[in-house]
Design a protein with these regions (language model features):
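PLP-dependent amino-acid enzyme catalytic core
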Residues: 1-211
Length: 211
């Protein structure tokens, strides 16, 4: 890496080639693990025990959450009259940070999360008010294909997130196509699920100023 510190990033073997190559270009060693992000997490913990390297959780970490919370600050800085924010949810790091930042400054702003129907770990946890781990997940939105939400992120979502909804694979695909055709943007599945939730009227946002 830039500071000459060795880093190993564990990813599921189905991770997009672009993500793998971009990570390598920044100086990291990439370890591809068969399965999901949860399997990659388990491999990272195993490597930490073997090597003594420092383990950094991809989402259930206070500093990671704080860093992602700066997105919420930027949103409020650019759109101070905002009504709502819609955030993709996997393990919950991004939405935890964004929700904490926004609710700390503008508690009236709604913060909504969106998960894939095939990987609804945080959705189930919040709606059943009980931390949930899924046995299996299935979605092409690899960035949010998570069986186990973070324990810290679950607590933060319980306190600061107004609601989480799910979208189907077809709805996500339609959102990707809409972004490409209408906005000339190429989005991955994880980035398109908030748009899918808006397009298919999953949330009470009509007439609102929404990010």
């Amino acid at each position: 890496t830039r500071r000459g510190i060795k880093s190993i990033v564990c990813m599921p073997d189905g991770a997009p080639i672009m993500k793998v190559e971009n990570t390598k270009s920044l100086g990291a060693e990439v370890c591809l693990v068969p399965g999901t992000y949860d399997d990659a997490h388990d491999k990272a913990v195993e490597l930490q025990a073997e090597t003594g390297m420092t383990f950094i959780h991809p989402y259930d970490d206070e500093q990671v959450i704080a860093g992602q919370g700066t997105i919420g600050l930027e949103i409020l800085d650019q759109l101070p009259d905002l009504d709502a924010v819609i955030v993709p949810v996997g393990g919950g790091g991004l939405i935890s940070g964004v929700a904490f930042a926004i609710k700390s400054l503008r508690p009236e702003v709604k913060v909504y999360g969106v998960q894939a129907e095939g990987a609804p770990s945080m959705y189930r946890s919040l709606h059943e008010h009980k931390y949930q781990t899924l046995k299996n997940v299935a979605t092409f939105a690899d960035g949010i294909q998570v069986k186990t939400p973070g324990e810290l992120t679950y607590q933060l979502c319980e306190e600061y997130v107004d609601d989480i909804v799910t979208v189907s694979e077809d709805e996500t695909a339609a959102a990707i196509l809409s972004l490409m055709e209408n906005q000339k943007l190429v989005a991955e599945g994880a980035g398109a699920v908030p748009v899918a939730a808006a397009l298919f009227h999953k949330l009470p946002i009509e007439g609102k100023k929404v990010v």
